[in-house]
Amino acid sequence: MAAFLSAGLGILAPSETYPLPTTSSGWEPRLGSPFPSGPCTSSTGAQAVAEPTGQGPKNPRVSRVTVQLEMKPLWEEFNQLGTEMIVTKAGRRMFPPFQVKILGMDSLADYALLMDFIPLDDKRYRYAFHSSAWLVAGKADPATPGRVHFHPDSPAKGAQWMRQIVSFDKLKLTNNLLDDNGHIILNSMHRYQPRFHVVFVDPRKDSERYAQENFKSFIFTETQFTAVTAYQNHRITQLKIASNPFAKGFRESDLDSWPVAPRPLLSVPARSHSSLSPCVLKGATDREKDPNKASASTSKTPAWLHHQLLPPPEVLLAPATYRPVTYQSLYSGAPSHLGIPRTRPAPYPLPNIRADRDQGGLPLPAGLGLLSPTVVCLGPGQDSQ
């Protein structure tokens, strides 16, 4: 497959604050905003295009592309409260998921779609429960390794992208700096802005020369959020439960009326943050009745899960710091200045695993602006050469 990412796309490091498009003074506090200050979080319309200065003219195959954010009213509702997104060591999917409708592509041309996340500012935040507001807690933590998430169907014809809603529901957020599954790495209690990029796969052999004109970036200010390890604003929790179709079990019961966990569960190690489920109760009972059976199940379940969840060997490991980097190293035969392997990690899709409740197992959930990521996460069906 012809190389489709050109050199020279990496100029603005993701660790830098991105100049967001605004309709007024962008650094004035918005009335009713849960944040003390920061970029204006109001949307500029059904679509928002952000192209840093100095890009020059664009290829007609991307200049006419327009993007519409799906579930815009829901995003705006979350934004009014101050959207929060959970980050975990294993990686957590976003809700609402980032979904867009694309128009204006060349039906016969190939395009790659990708996303990255940039800090909104250089601050770290904390949530004040007494005032239900976010407060600045200090200077931002050291920047996390910058990564780009490719849509798993990339590259594909424009006709395919425009035929249906494009969803990045496989994208996961993590706070694990050593993540080797290709997830987006973020700092907890920091604010981020997702960016969406459309890249034209230029078939010309010298496509590196046209790198600056072969992509177009889009930004929707209503999708910005604060990364958290647990929801801080109870209204965000309620809205997530009310609007997430996978939270049916929470809606059908009163959270305040849940029974207190039995005493044996208090011995569960504190390092385990997984929600306790009925299968844990069953497993605990089995261990009390038959210790031999319990030891057998605990010896089988981890090995079974390890076999199913073993990440592919070609997954990339992010470097320790951000550095502006070009995509020239992704081309076949081009020198690799950072030593980035040209193999693709495939963090998705993981197999749909159901734990054997008789074994006491835990059920698993169903679950470029001028761009300079330091690690590229390719999806299935992609070849970097």
Curated annotation (Swiss-Prot):
One of its GO terms (molecular function) is DNA-binding transcription factor activity, RNA polymerase II-specific. It comes from the Eukaryota. One of its GO terms (biological process) is anatomical structure morphogenesis. Its main location: nucleus. Residues 22-61 are annotated as: Disordered. SMART domains: TBOX. The keyword DNA-binding applies. Keywords: DNA-binding, Nucleus, Transcription, Transcription regulation. Probable transcriptional regulator involved in developmental processes. This is T-box transcription factor TBX10. It comes from Homo sapiens (Human).
